[in-house]
Structure formats: structure tokens, C-alpha cells
Amino acid sequence: MATAILPSTSGVIGLWDGTTDGKEGFMDYANGDTNVKQPKEYEIQVHDIRKLDPQPTLLKNGYELVDIPTVVTDEQFIESGKSDEGNAYIKDVYFAECKRIIEEVSGGVDLIIPVSFRMREQKGEKESTTKKLGNIESRYAPRPVAHLDRDTPTAITVLEETVGKEKAQELLSKHKRWAQVNVWRPIGNPATMWPLCFLNHDRIPTWNYDTHVGHVWSLNDPRVSDRGQKTYDCVVKHDDRYDYHYVSDLRPEECLVFCSFDSIPKYAMPHSAFWDNNVPADAPNRRSIEVRSLVFF
């Protein structure tokens, strides 16, 4: 029997390329000093999640496409970055929506704690977006390098910041599995430019944070104010066995729910914005919002 050819697109993704001196990576956001090489770009084939059968799910694969609209308007999303009132509205109304989405997708979990959100907007073409990686201004742009939001030590850091060390220890003792779950949604237009890509590692049985992640230690990091403390970023290393998945023309009425950290590495989902070689020349700039929640199963 012939093997079915999955609908896909071709594109470019950035992955860890090490440091200039062979030491642990660092980035000083105050002056731009770093020993981290620019991400190495790889040509990839990216399969459309819409066409996968069976569909990946949060519980089985660590990521899932859902069709759940929001009551928040485009203007209210955009206002969140302009005023304290707009920020508070997102944390009140949209955080509650994201909790309900996670509850529905997971079939019910013990505890969901929304902790932060990030608005992103793509400005400029592929080259300008890639070159700005690591600059302060790039923190609100799509990240064209494969990464995980956190690993175990840095996830414990944000947990302790959020609930305190004593409560954190209580939760960790009670739950065998916990994760940071992101709800990622386009704003205004479909996410055609710089779509989000998942690096499925089901074919890598030994995949874990130690073997497939490089560290970039942060100094004077301006992102602390909106994502919490994190001593280093987790940049993903290349492996020929990754399967790359995305959603074609993800609509604002849809969202992607995925584990950006999981205490069981099998479910931790490396992800990245990627350059789609087949993106229409007139595709609109990409705006998106992601809400990060600590989830205890």
C-alpha cells in the first residue's frame, strides 16, 4: 500500500547553534553582549494539523487545535499593551476564558493558575525579524527560534513567585504531573505570516530537557516584568527525527493549547514562529496573544 502524503508547506526554522566560546550561553540585554551564535536556519517540511488523523491532543501529545471564540475584541486585546485598565481587563476576562478552555481540553484538572500573557506583533520581513532576535525590541515580536518557555528549575521559579515557596512545595508533593499550558490565539487576522510551529518529538524516545535544550542565561532582562523571573531561556537543539506541525491560516476564533513546559518531558512541546516559504506576498502582519497558566493534573 502506498504511503499517504500529508498536506504540508516548506519553511525555515531557527535552532540552537551553540556559543562562540563553547561555554554556557548568556545575553546581557542592557548592552547586547552575548556569546550565543545566531540560530542556525534549517529548511523544513511542516505538516498541517488540520489534515492530521488522528488529531493531536493536549493529553496525548502535548498540543491541540480548538475552535473556541473569545468575547474580547481586537481593540481590547491591543489596549492591553497601552493602559493599566486594558491590562487588567485581559487578566480578568480573558484569563477566565483561558481557564475554561484548558478545563474543556483537559477534561478537567485539579488546579489552573493563569500567570502571565504576551502580545506579539510581526513587523518587517523575514530578514529583519530574524536579525532583531535577542534585541529588547524583539520581545513583542514572533520568536523565529525553537524554544520551550521553561524547564523544571525555571518552572519551579515561576511557581514559587506565584504562590510562595511553601504552597509550591505542597502542590509539587501532591501532584505527579504539572505543566505550564499556553493558550495561543491570533488577533484580527488569520496567522498566515509567521505561523506557530510545533516540534513533535514522538519519534525521539530519549528526548528530554538535558539532551535537546541549550541555555541562554539572562542579564538585565526586561521581560521579567511581564513573564516573571527566569534565569535562562531554553533553546531547542536540532534532531532529524522531529516532525514539524502547524495550522494553516489559524483564525482568531481558534486557538492552540499546548504544554510549553511539562514535568513529564514527553508532553513538553518545543515551538517557534517559522517562515512559510509559501506565504502570500500580501499576507497581513501577524498579531497574537498567548496566556500562560500553571496546570496541575
From Swiss-Prot:
Write out the similarity annotation: Belongs to the asaB hydroxylase/desaturase family.
> Which Enzyme Commission number(s) are on file for it?
1.-.-.-
Return the InterPro entries for the record. Answer: AsaB-like
Q: Which organism is it from?
A: Phoma sp. (strain ATCC 20986 / MF5453)
Q: Which pathway does the database say it acts in?
A: Secondary metabolite biosynthesis
Kindly list the GO molecular function terms attached to this UniProt entry: oxidoreductase activity
User: Lineage of the source organism?
Assistant: Eukaryota, Fungi, Dikarya, Ascomycota, Pezizomycotina
The record describes the protein's role as: Oxidoreductase; part of the gene cluster that mediates the biosynthesis of squalestatin S1 (SQS1, also known as zaragozic acid A), a heavily oxidized fungal polyketide that offers potent cholesterol lowering activity by targeting squalene synthase (SS). SQS1 is composed of a 2,8-dioxobicyclic[3.2.1]octane-3,4,5-tricarboxyclic acid core that is connected to two lipophilic polyketide arms.
Q: Gene symbol?
A: R1
Keywords of the record: Oxidoreductase
- Can you say what this protein is called? Oxidoreductase R1
